[in-house]
Amino acid sequence: MTSITHDQRPSKLVPPHGSAELKPLLLNGEARNQALKLASTLPAITLSSRERGDLIMFGIGGFTPLNGFMNQADWQGVVDNMRLQSGDNAGLFWPIPITLSAPKATADSLNQGDKVALVAQDGEIMGILTVEETYTIDKEHECQQVFTTTDPEHPGVQQVLEQGEVNIAGSVEVLSEGEFPTLYPEIYKTPAETRAILDNKGWQTVAAFQTRNPMHRSHEYLAKIAIEICDGVLIHSLLGALKPGDIPADVRQEAIKTLIDNYFRADTVIQAGYPLDMRYAGPREALLHAVFRQNYGCSHLIVGRDHAGVGDYYGAFDAQTIFDHVGKDDLITQPLKIGWTFWCNACNAMASDKTCPHEASEHVKVSGTKLRKALSEDLDVPENFSRPEVLQILRDYYAGIAFDERAEVKLVGASAV
C-alpha cells in the first residue's frame, strides 16, 4: 500500500514497521473527553518515567504496530528471540520488551477485561489500559538478555530491578502527549508529522542521527557522511529522561540548531525530537532505534561508536555487529556503520580509520563524554572538539550550575579511548 501525502503525491518513504500504515493510539476530541471522564472513575497505575515515554510512543504511532504493553508470550519471545509471539503480530521482529509493571497488590485486584487509568507521577491521566493478563517475570533474565548484564549500577538494569513485581499486559488508549508539544514546539514531531515534512521535501532515503548529546565535530562528520549517501538527515534528539550529568534537551536543542544554522545546508537536514527515555541497552537499543525510525520514515540509521551505550558494558562497535544477525525481511531500516572518527592533526581535518593514513598520535578522538567532562570541570576544550558557537552555548549552561552541584562525569569504556 502506498501512502499519500496531503498534496496527493505518493510517498517514496519506507513503510512503517510491520504495517502498511501508522497505528497511532492517541484519542482526540470528544472521544478523548469521554475517556478522561471514564479514567477519573477507574483504579490507577502510576507510570514510571520510562513507561510514560513508551505510552506516548504508542499514542503517536512511534511503536507501530503494537497496540499496548506486552503480554507474557510477547515478553518471553522478545527477551529471548527478539520476536513477538502472539496475535496478529506473531513472528514480527521486536528487539526490546515494552512492558508495564505494578505492585502485586494492584495486580491481584485486576481481572481480564478490567480497565485501569494510567497516571503520570505528577498526577496527569495519560491513558487507559484494558487488562489482558498479569504475569511475573525473571527480572535478572530480562536484564542479562537485553542489557547483557545484571549489574544494578547499569541505569537500564536499575530501572528493571526497581519496577513493580508484576507486569500488566493490555491494549491502551492514549490521552496525552505530556509536556512535549508545548515544551519543544519547534522540534517535537510525531511520526506522521515527520513523514509529511520528509515527503514535502521529496526525500526517499533518509538517515536518522540518534543523539542524546549536543553535536560535537565527530557527530557533525557522521551526519555529513550520511548526507553524501542519502537525500537528507533527520537529527533526532531524545527528549525524555537521561542519566545524571547529561545535558538537558532544551540546551541540546539550541546547540544543535546553532550547528545546523552555521555548518549545514538547510535543505539537507531536519532537527526533530521524540519522547522516549534512554534505556542504555547498547546493541539491543540500536535495533529499537532502527525499528521506530522506520515508523518515522527513515531508511537508514547512523550507527557509530558505542551507540546507546553507557560505561564499559558494551564493545565500541557491538551496536553495529548486532545488525548482522537481523534479516533484511525483519527490518527495512538499515544501519550506516561508521567506524572510529577523530580529528587528525596531520590531515588538519576530521577523518576516520578508513580514510586517514597517519599514526594514532596525530588523532584527537572526540566523544560527548569527554566534552561533558571538560565543560563540567571548567577545563580547556580543544578547538577541534566542537564548533565555537556550540561551545559557547554549553559553557553558558555550565556557568549556571554551581561547581559543587555538577554531576561527576567518568571516562570509561569507549569514551575513555
Swiss-Prot record:
It comes from the Bacteria. Gene3D superfamilies: HUPs, Sulfate adenylyltransferase. Its EC number is 2.7.7.4. Keywords: ATP-binding, Nucleotide-binding, Nucleotidyltransferase, Transferase. One of its GO terms (molecular function) is ATP binding. InterPro entries: ATP-Sase_PUA-like_dom, PUA-like_sf, Rossmann-like_a/b/a_fold, SO4_adenylyltransferase_pro, Sulfurylase_cat_dom, Sulphate_adenylyltransferase. One of its GO terms (biological process) is sulfate assimilation. Pathway: Sulfur metabolism; hydrogen sulfide biosynthesis; sulfite from sulfate: step 1/3. It catalyses: sulfate + ATP + H(+) = adenosine 5'-phosphosulfate + diphosphate. Belongs to the sulfate adenylyltransferase family. This is Sulfate adenylyltransferase. It comes from Psychrobacter cryohalolentis (strain ATCC BAA-1226 / DSM 17306 / VKM B-2378 / K5). The lineage of its organism: Bacteria, Pseudomonadati, Pseudomonadota, Gammaproteobacteria, Moraxellales.
